[in-house]
């Protein structure tokens, strides 16, 4: 074989390799491009001031001077067993282990909250048809534990299919917040929180809080606000805007003469120093665990943060980059804010992350 012939053969081989590589690259670009178009085209925010339809009726009358119990619990879409790690926290997993695991986790959370016999209960990350939780309607599971009461449900976010991680995509998410009341909820509203308008909005998803109104003897209202603030994709400006809106809600209701209790997952270091006190004084920065902006409350004199714990500090959350074991990073992110005409009579954390508060209306 002559050198010229060898050269021609090599040129053909190289040409075919380049054509094949170009075709593969082109196909990848096309698929990625189509996916980006799908995500962008399917993105939409749920409208603000959306009226919700309360279900059921309660048998309790709310009056001043009486003691009531409220509990808040983030169900973590039914995935967070002790050894679960989450990819957005630096862990490995993007979905719950199994449908049975989801059901067991949700039932355990609902049972724990019910054990406090609360007059009011707030749940966050209640999935109703998400890939990550095997399309299980967690709302219906929780409702089985709270019969004979009034409830409202607000969709927090509904996302397009997230094709990441590649080997086990997180998928589509449909998740919301569920509020229970032994007194009848007269009306309820979904309020849209400020979120990023840039690309990070596709990571942060939609965000909201729900407002459930319960009549009080004498004509006023007890306003129950169930909240789940941003963790991923939120800038300092977005975090501040969300907190301003929540604090403004408290101030507005107080100015009307109403009573306001805000409970849920604030995705902040709720005490401002729990990351140090719960972790041996160590400064730990996971980005989303920013200190609660206590200085903002000066602009909302009616708002009070319930941090006078009767049983000491106990964590409500862990960073899910590694399976849990004693000594791992923990933090307090869940809690309650109230209007100052609500007297906090007792406050504690349970061993399984719900936050419990006893209060009276002044």
Model-derived segments and their meaning:
Residues 92-99, 126-128, 193-201, 228-237:
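Surface-exposed cleft-lining segments at the edges of enzyme active sites
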Residues 143-147, 172-188, 327-341, 359-360:
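Conserved beta strand-loop-helix elements of the APE1-like EEP
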